Amino acid sequence: MAADAKKETIRLTTAQALVRFLNQQYIDVDGQVTSFVEGLFAIFGHGNVLGLGEALQEDPGHLKVYQGHNEQGMASTAIAYSRQLYRHKIFAVTASAGPGSANFVTAAGNAYVNSIPILFLPADTFATRQPDPVLQQIEVDYSADTTTNDVLKPVSKYWDRIERPEQLMSALLKAFEVLTNPATAGPVTIALPQDVEGQAYDYPLSFFKKRVHVVKRVQPSSAELAGAVELIQASQTPVLIVGGGAKFSDAGAAIETFSERFNIPIVETPTGKSAISSDFPNNMGGTGILGTAAANAVITKADLIIGAGTRYTDFTTASKTAIHPGKTQLININLNRMQSYKFDAFPIVADVRDTLSQLTESLSDYRSQFTDLATIKEAWQKERQRLAHTNYDAPAYVPEVKNQFDAKTMAAYAEKLQTHLTQTEAVIAVNNTIDPTSIIVAAAGSLPGDVQRIWDPVVPNTYHMEYGYSMMGYEVPAALGIKLAQPDQESYALVGDGSFMMLHSELVTALQYHKKINILVFDNSGFASINNLQMAQGSNSYLTEFRTSDNDIMKTDFAKIAEGYGAKAYRANDRKSLIAAIEDAKKQTVSTLIDIKVLPKTMTQGYGQSWWRVGVSEISNNPKVQKAYQDIQTGIDKAFKY
């Protein structure tokens, strides 16, 4: 008996067992079975190089193992990879104990907010505690069981620490239920004490069997369908909001059929954008604070809002003024029950694609009363054309962001940066020049607002926006994740100078592994979007421009930085040089960077429904701030309260 039992086990270290288990995880989406864990990003230190590092070096299986260059950066690459593939595949990431693993926290927050599966494998202190305190250990007075990795608990959907080799089994089974469940997907942390990583155990062979995690499309109940049909049939001007959940559901075709059949306009959240083509006639574009005039116009007319996989963030709802249950009824389709309950909506806890398809079958001959959708969209396209040709050299030029910088300040920026290029002109020039199958990513600063309004993604799933956590520094590592996910398509990071400075280390990873990415740095020498907010709320410009202690505008040569890494770099300060740089970059096989100097205050501004509740000071000596505070109070009075 004992001998037979022995044959049914295999003696492995904890790290070896982990690697073997990862190799056996598969996912079934609509009958298509693929491996779930593509690989692992690693920055090795003393806490993981001898345990997990040795296991990967000895036998990684099919896992692709990449060396990262910043923990937050490589985790962002993993997040973008999974997001681009609708969460059907993941990367794991590992770092050493202490500061290396602490660098995961921001990325974990990003994954949590956006419901993106990623497996964090931070090294930890010794489970035995014999050598305590070890290098990079935090000694906590109230608990010897607390380490740096505990900081990952609030930003993990599941968190565990493996203090004995056999604990790995139950921990991983729970972890992969979370990682493969569309309703609960998000970051998982499995902390690995460095002594336990190398400890051996007789693991049951059954633990390493091929495991296929079936992604079930949750169907709406008959009561949910009947209730939604009744609400839609009673409405005259319904609007469909397409959120990130609709994209993850691969609901594009169902959305178009539903919209076309019933003449229902579509508006998009930042995450939902490109679920369908921008050319689709009823697609009015981005909605909310960063929305188009077309999208916000139809939202204003809506008597029913159908939310398809949206979380209703403040940027979508204009801090609950554009969407108000006291004025508009709502239907929420979401796999997450809590999300479906928002705004006192009629909840449908189900898959977006299948719910819309079944509603299409049930609504029969219904048609909305919208008669002017084409006119509304055409008017917005005319405005987009104007923004494509804004000209600083025109007589009496007025920037899009008005009444903040005077003509003298604008001239100083033009002289220092040696540019007359406006940001809207540059963004649309890029949109019109890159191949339509190319994928762009943006995340922070003023660029998310510009691309939400004026970027037209003709090809679905070519627009990758991280505006849930709006993590500065996401863009460059995300471009690499996108390239790994879609190697046959060009990947472009649209990034401001402030965000690029915060994090761009995975450009080195892209160069190291010959994965071409393209970085477009829009440099206006400052944290310009926050400067806009600061001045719009009455404050003076303060620590949001990049100026020396002598108050001189700073100019950074980002092209030279990229060249130092080994990338092909370009400089652009007008439309002609920008287009020429893009065209030449297309021909390159190495990663590229275009240093685009743009003028501040030349990004897009609000179009209707753009009130945003921010924390203006109640007491200030500045009369402009006093007025801004009163304006905020007026907005609060109009907003929905919960």
Swiss-Prot record:
<dbReference type="GO" id="GO:0000287">
    <property type="term" value="F:magnesium ion binding"/>
</dbReference>
<dbReference type="InterPro" id="IPR029061">
    <property type="entry name" value="THDP-binding"/>
</dbReference>
<dbReference type="Pfam" id="PF02776">
    <property type="entry name" value="TPP_enzyme_N"/>
</dbReference>
<keyword id="KW-0479">Metal-binding</keyword>
<dbReference type="InterPro" id="IPR000399">
    <property type="entry name" value="TPP-bd_CS"/>
</dbReference>
<dbReference type="InterPro" id="IPR030817">
    <property type="entry name" value="Myo_inos_IolD"/>
</dbReference>
<dbReference type="Pfam" id="PF02775">
    <property type="entry name" value="TPP_enzyme_C"/>
</dbReference>
<feature type="region of interest" description="Thiamine pyrophosphate binding">
    <location>
        <begin position="446"/>
        <end position="526"/>
    </location>
</feature>
<feature type="binding site">
    <location>
        <position position="524"/>
    </location>
    <ligand>
        <name>Mg(2+)</name>
    </ligand>
</feature>
<dbReference type="GO" id="GO:0019310">
    <property type="term" value="P:inositol catabolic process"/>
</dbReference>
<dbReference type="GO" id="GO:0009097">
    <property type="term" value="P:isoleucine biosynthetic process"/>
</dbReference>
<dbReference type="GO" id="GO:0030976">
    <property type="term" value="F:thiamine pyrophosphate binding"/>
</dbReference>
<keyword id="KW-0460">Magnesium</keyword>
<comment type="similarity">
    <text>Belongs to the TPP enzyme family.</text>
</comment>
<keyword id="KW-0378">Hydrolase</keyword>
<dbReference type="InterPro" id="IPR029035">
    <property type="entry name" value="DHS-like_NAD/FAD-binding_dom"/>
</dbReference>
<dbReference type="InterPro" id="IPR045229">
    <property type="entry name" value="TPP_enz"/>
</dbReference>
<feature type="binding site">
    <location>
        <position position="71"/>
    </location>
    <ligand>
        <name>thiamine diphosphate</name>
    </ligand>
</feature>
<protein>
    <recommendedName>
        <fullName>3D-(3,5/4)-trihydroxycyclohexane-1,2-dione hydrolase</fullName>
        <ecNumber>3.7.1.22</ecNumber>
    </recommendedName>
</protein>
<dbReference type="Pfam" id="PF00205">
    <property type="entry name" value="TPP_enzyme_M"/>
</dbReference>
<dbReference type="InterPro" id="IPR012000">
    <property type="entry name" value="Thiamin_PyroP_enz_cen_dom"/>
</dbReference>
<dbReference type="GO" id="GO:0005948">
    <property type="term" value="C:acetolactate synthase complex"/>
</dbReference>
<keyword id="KW-0786">Thiamine pyrophosphate</keyword>
<feature type="binding site">
    <location>
        <position position="497"/>
    </location>
    <ligand>
        <name>Mg(2+)</name>
    </ligand>
</feature>
<dbReference type="InterPro" id="IPR012001">
    <property type="entry name" value="Thiamin_PyroP_enz_TPP-bd_dom"/>
</dbReference>
<comment type="function">
    <text>Involved in the cleavage of the C1-C2 bond of 3D-(3,5/4)-trihydroxycyclohexane-1,2-dione (THcHDO) to yield 5-deoxy-glucuronate (5DG).</text>
</comment>
<dbReference type="GO" id="GO:0050660">
    <property type="term" value="F:flavin adenine dinucleotide binding"/>
</dbReference>
<dbReference type="InterPro" id="IPR023757">
    <property type="entry name" value="THcHDO_hydrolase_firmi"/>
</dbReference>
<dbReference type="GO" id="GO:0102481">
    <property type="term" value="F:3D-(3,5/4)-trihydroxycyclohexane-1,2-dione hydrolase activity"/>
</dbReference>
<dbReference type="GO" id="GO:0009099">
    <property type="term" value="P:L-valine biosynthetic process"/>
</dbReference>
<dbReference type="GO" id="GO:0003984">
    <property type="term" value="F:acetolactate synthase activity"/>
</dbReference>
<keyword id="KW-0520">NAD</keyword>
<comment type="pathway">
    <text>Polyol metabolism; myo-inositol degradation into acetyl-CoA; acetyl-CoA from myo-inositol: step 3/7.</text>
</comment>
<dbReference type="InterPro" id="IPR011766">
    <property type="entry name" value="TPP_enzyme_TPP-bd"/>
</dbReference>
